[in-house]
A protein has these predicted regions:
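Phosphate-binding loop that captures ATP/GTP phosphates
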Residues: 171-234, 238-246
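Residue-level signature of catalytic and energy-coupling elements of molecular machines
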Residues: 40, 58, 87, 101, ...
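C-terminal lobe/tail of nucleotide-utilizing enzymes
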Residues: 55, 91, 104, 108-109, ...
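N-proximal, solvent-exposed amphipathic alpha-helical segments enriched in charged/polar residues
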Residues: 2-59, 63
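Walker A/P-loop phosphate-binding motif and the immediately C-terminal alpha-helix
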Residues: 147-185, 298
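Extreme N-terminal, non-catalytic leader segments
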Residues: 54-60, 64-72, 76, 83, ...
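Short, hydrophobic beta-strand segments
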Residues: 18-24, 74-84, 149-151, 279-280
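Inter-motif core of Ras-like GTPase G domains
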Residues: 245-249, 268-289
Length: 399
């Protein structure tokens, strides 16, 4: 444990509740401290993914009996030290603490939260502890549970980023701990599509990903600004990916999506080298000019240790009144699937066909994934159902 006060200091030796049938009721405030501390150990910091007690954020719990017990039996003050002043998730953490205290079953408690920020020394120790646990790229360690999908396309304009955003939002809405990296350094778009205009929190050189619509995000656009052109050569691109993987505290997500740049350039090679357990999802539209190029993006798997999980055909049709219009033709996704299956020597399925819908653009450009309602729950549209099927197929498939 880093900093903070241990469980034994709150009167719960050996992990017990500290309360039994022989409880000395005059000593009950001390017993309450122990049980409240245990309850707070289940409150998880949403950025770091660890218990606030393990992180040393709980510095004291003070329990005082009330004279007037009309509304509560005890006043409980929880003293909390957050990582930095103005922590963006301060309200989320304090709400969870209040919930843990107010739902205490053995007495009626009125909670008060005193919030401060960690000292520089304590924060340095915490960051050192977190870095020691991680050391380097966390997605290559043995036994990693995270499924990693690199979303690729042969050319731009096929809706690859829209597919990435809506797939990530769907996975998060289904309950998966979801992370996404905007690996399209020159053409970054995830911040706008997720409605993000803030920079990641910097904890002494370790970055906390920005969370939007339940998805943990990182993008060069969060640092460069939307009006700046990125002019980097290959080695700098590779270094940016390494930093996104190693210098960002991801926790242990269930799934990581990478929105690749179109084509088969430096970043595609860097992803394959840095994440050899990643799986490629190829996005195309139906017309041959897109599908023929998409095949080449999948053939990267012949030269690097990456498996192609499947193909997504985007903009497959447009429903207008009673007409089912195939604006970009038909069959492109299946052609890519067939050609990659033959070339790679294993089955590369057509995972999904997605309709062309104006809402993907209009809602997406407002900063909300089109598969979600304004409250963040999954929409009941045909598009959302297709993304749900795609998400479940990807997560259920054997890697």
């Amino acid at each position: 444990m880093v900093g903070g006060m241990g469980q034994e200091q709150f009167g719960t030796e050996n992990g017990g509740s500290g309360v039994n049938d022989q409880t000395d009721w005059e000593d009950f405030p001390r017993r309450i401290k122990g049980e409240v501390f245990e309850r707070l150990s289940k409150v998880i910091d949403p950025e770091l993914g660890r218990s606030i007690t393990d992180l040393g954020m709980i510095t004291d719990i003070v329990v005082v009996p009330r004279r007037d017990t009309t509304e509560a039996d005890y006043d409980v003050t929880v003293r909390v030290e957050l990582t930095i002043k103005g922590c963006p998730l301060s309200q989320t953490i304090t709400n969870q603490i209040n919930g843990a205290v107010s739902s205490y079953p053995r007495a009626r408690l009125h909670s008060r939260i005193d919030v401060a920020s960690m000292s520089k020394e304590k924060l340095n120790n915490l960051v050192a502890d977190l870095k020691a646990a991680r050391r380097s790229n966390p997605f290559t360690k043995p036994g990693i549970k995270t499924r990693i999908f690199a979303i690729a396309s042969g050319k731009g304009g096929v809706g690859k980023s829209s597919v990435t955003v809506n797939l990530a939002a769907t996975l998060a809405a289904l309950g998966y701990d979801t992370a996404a990296i905007d690996a399209d350094i020159y053409g970054f778009s995830l911040p706008n599509l997720f409605g993000v205009d803030t920079q990641p929190t910097n904890l002494n050189g370790m970055l906390m990903p920005v969370t939007a619509w339940g998805v943990k995000l990182i993008s060069i656009g969060m640092f460069a600004g939307s009006d700046r052109a990125i002019l980097w050569r290959g080695p700098r691109l590779q270094r940016s990916l390494e930093q996104f993987l190693s210098d960002v505290w991801w926790g242990d997500p269930d799934v990581l999506l990478l929105d690749l740049a179109p084509g088969t350039g430096d970043m595609a090679l860097s992803v394959a080298q840095a994440l050899p357990n990643s799986e490629l999802v190829v996005v195309t539209t139906p017309q041959p000019s897109a599908s023929d190029v998409a095949v080449r993006s999948g053939l990267v798997a012949l030269q690097v240790p990456t498996r192609v999980r499947g193909v997504v055909e985007n903009m497959s049709w447009y429903d207008h009144q009673d007409e089912h219009l195939e604006i970009f033709g038909s069959g492109g996704g299946q052609r890519v699937s067939d050609q990659l299956t033959e070339a790679l020597g294993y089955q590369v399925p057509l995972l999904a066909q997605l309709p062309l819908q104006p809402e993907v653009r209009t809602v997406g450009e407002s900063g909300r994934p089109a598969v979600l309602k304004p409250d963040g729950s999954l929409d009941d549209s045909d598009l959302a159902r297709r993304f749900v099927d795609l998400a479940r197929t990807l997560m259920s498939a054997t890697s």
